[in-house]
Swiss-Prot record:
It holds the Pfam family SiaC. This is Uncharacterized protein PA14_02130. InterPro entries: SiaC. It comes from Pseudomonas aeruginosa (strain UCBPP-PA14). The modification Phosphothreonine is found at T68.
Length: 126
């Protein structure tokens, strides 16, 4: 299958899906005009990856801000991971944030409450 490369802009995160490594990373702000257009292709990539065997999938996030529609899209992605995890698939998420940005830490905590798969929240001095 293929990798996913979506360049970041002022209002959208840079998104890389590495099929071989089993890693999806996102970094930057997320307040796109059309979050479905942006995240639809990410959700498709995750669905294809999860349908192809049993290899682990790791999400690595460095998201600074998410608007409401981006939060909804992220919830859809996490639901896919949770379903895969419940089916025995190894999945994990690591959310990095600037320790000065407590809002992002709180958002990550809220997401983690709904997930039973490994979900690390790591503070950094940016």
């Amino acid at each position: 299958m293929s990798d996913l490369h979506i360049p970041g802009t002022q209002s959208t995160p840079a998104i890389q899906g590495d099929w071989q490594a089993g890693r999806l990373s996102m970094q930057g702000d997320s307040y796109p005009e059309n979050s479905y257009e942006l995240f639809g292709q990410v959700i498709d990539w995750v669905e294809r990856f999860l349908a192809d065997g049993q290899r682990p999938l790791e999400l690595d996030l460095r998201l600074l801000y998410l608007n409401t529609s981006s939060i909804k899209a992220m919830m859809d992605i996490l639901d896919l991971l949770e379903e895969a995890h419940q089916g025995g698939r190894p999945v994990s998420l690591r959310w990095h944030y600037d320790r000065r940005n407590e809002r992002v830490a709180e958002l990550a905590e809220e997401f983690r409450e709904d997930c039973s798969f490994p979900f690390a929240i790591q503070a950094h001095d940016e």
